[in-house]
Design a protein with these regions (language model features):
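N-terminal amphipathic alpha-helix/helix-capping segment at the start of soluble metabolic enzymes
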Residues: 1-20, 69-70, 74
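Catalytic alpha/beta core domains of metabolic enzymes, predominantly
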Residues: 12, 116-250, 262-265
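Active-site mouth loops of central-metabolism enzymes
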Residues: 17-34, 58-60, 81-87, 107-108, ...
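Alpha-helix-loop-beta-strand connector modules within alpha/beta enzyme cores
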Residues: 61-85, 120-130, 180-195, 241-260, ...
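Catalytic beta/alpha-barrel core
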Residues: 64, 80-93, 102-117, 129-141, ...
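Domain-level signature for soluble enzymes in the chorismate/prephenate branch of the shikimate pathway
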Residues: 260-351
C-alpha cells in the first residue's frame, strides 16, 4: 500500500502545523458560527464540528444530526474555511458529501471495526474527499493500517491519520495514552503519510493541550486537531477538554517548531555509540537464549515443567531492584524481563 501526502484545497503542501479546530459537537447555529468566526480571525483554515456523536454510553448528547450540516455550509460561505465532520455510517457519508463538507474523519470506535470500515470505504468509493482515520481505541497498529488499506483499496487515496490516544483501564495523567511509538512506527512504514495529533482527546483536560501539542510538533506531526468552543464550560459534550478560540490562538503562538537540521558531528558520534551498544545487547540476548535452551534440555530430560513460577517471580523482583539501583524505571525493567522470559519459555516449549 502506498500513501501520499494529504491534499487539502487552499493549504500548501509544506504548511505546518495544519490546524483543524472547532467544537466537539455542533450544538446550535449560533454556537457554530460564533466559534467559527473567532477561529477564522486567528487564521485557522479548517473548522471541525461533530454532527453525529457516537458516545461510549447511551443517554449523553449524541449530536444534532443532519440539521447541523447547513450550519457547517454557512461557516464555509461566511469564513472561507474548509469544514470537516465525523462519519460512522454510509448514510453519514452520503449526507455529508451532499451538504458540501470538505473533509471527513473516522472515529476511533469505527476505525476498530473492520465491518464498519468496509461500509465506509464502499460509500466513499469514487470520491476524492480528504479522509482522516483516528487510531483504533486499542493499541493495535495493524488494525489502524487495516482501516487505511480498506479505504485505499476502494480508491480513496487522499487519506491521513489522527492520533487521539488509546484507551486503558488504568487512567492516570491522560484520558487516552498517546503511545507515541505507534504513530512513529506508522510513519516509518509510510514516510509520506500526513499525521495529525488530537491533544484534546489524549489529555482530556484543557491544561494538557499545550504540552501535548508541543510533543507532537517535536515528533514532526503535520498538524493538530483541537477542540475549541466559544463557551466551553457550557458545552454539551467533552466540556473539560475544549478551549476558547482565544486560548487556542495563544497556545498555537507558543509552539516551537524545530527546523530540520543536518546531524551534527557530536550526535553522529553518540548515535554510533548507540549502534555499538545495541549490537552488544543483541549478542548478550543471543547468549542468554542459548543458555535457556540448555536449561530447557535439562528440564526435558528430567521431566521438569518448563514454567517455574517461583523462579520467574524471583527474576522479576531481583531485576527490578537492580534496575532501580541503576536509575531505570521499574515498569520499563518489568516489561523487558517479561519479554525475555516469554522468549525463553517459547524456546523451551519448542524442544
Amino acid at each position: 500500500m502506498e500513501i501520499n501526502r494529504l491534499v487539502l484545497p487552499g493549504i500548501e503542501a509544506d504548511e505546518r502545523p495544519i490546524i483543524i479546530a472547532g467544537p466537539c459537537s455542533a450544538e446550535s447555529r449560533e454556537q457554530v458560527l460564533n466559534t467559527a468566526q473567532e477561529l477564522a480571525k486567528n487564521g485557522v483554515k479548517v473548522f471541525r464540528a461533530g454532527i453525529w456523536k457516537p458516545r461510549t454510553k447511551p443517554g449523553g448528547f449524541e449530536g444534532v444530526g443532519t440539521v447541523g450540516l447547513p450550519w457547517l455550509k454557512e461557516v464555509k460561505q461566511k469564513t472561507g474555511m474548509l469544514v470537516a465532520t465525523e462519519v460512522a455510517t454510509a448514510a453519514h457519508v452520503f449526507e455529508a458529501i451532499k451538504a458540501g463538507i470538505d473533509m471527513l474523519w473516522i472515529g476511533a470506535r469505527t476505525a476498530a471495526n473492520p465491518f464498519a470500515m468496509q461500509e465506509l470505504a464502499d460509500a466513499l468509493r469514487g470520491t476524492d474527499i480528504p479522509v482522516l482515520v483516528k487510531n483504533p481505541v486499542n493499541p493495535d497498529l495493524e488494525l489502524w493500517i487495516g482501516a487505511l488499506e480498506r479505504l485505499v483499496n476502494a480508491g480513496v487515496n487522499n487519506v491521513g491519520v489522527i492520533l487521539r490516544g488509546f484507551s486503558t483501564y488504568d487512567q492516570k495523567i491522560y484520558r487516552n495514552l498517546p503511545l507515541w511509538h505507534i504513530p512513529i512506527e506508522l510513519r516509518r512504514r509510510y514516510p509520506n503519510i500526513t499525521m495529525f495529533c488530537d491533544p484534546s482527546h489524549i489529555g482530556g483536560k484543557r491544561e494538557l493541550i499545550a504540552p501535548i501539542s508541543q510533543q507532537a510538533m517535536d515528533l514532526k506531526f503535520d498538524g493538530l486537531m483541537i477542540e475549541s468552543h466559544c463557551n466551553p464550560d457550557e458545552a454539551l459534550s467533552d466540556a473539560k477538554q475544549q478551549i476558547t478560540p482565544q486560548i487556542l490562538d495563544f497556545t498555537l503562538k507558543m509552539l516551537v517548531l524545530r527546523e530540520n537540521v543536518q546531524t551534527t558531528e557530536n550526535i553522529s558520534v553518540l548515535r554510533k555509540q548507540i549502534d555499538e551498544i545495541d549490537e552488544q545487547l543483541l549478542t548478550i540476548l543471543a547468549k542468554r537464549n542459548r543458555i535457556s535452551r540448555e536449561i530447557g534440555m535439562y528440564k526435558k530430560e528430567n521431566n521438569m515443567p518448563v514454567l517455574q513460577t517461583g523462579r520467574y517471580n524471583e527474576i522479576l523482583e531481583k531485576r527490578a531492584q537492580m534496575g532501580e539501583a541503576m536509575n531505570l524505571d521499574k515498569e520499563f525493567v518489568f516489561a523487558i524481563m517479561k519479554a525475555i522470559h516469554e522468549e525463553s519459555v517459547k524456546i523451551q516449549l519448542a524442544l
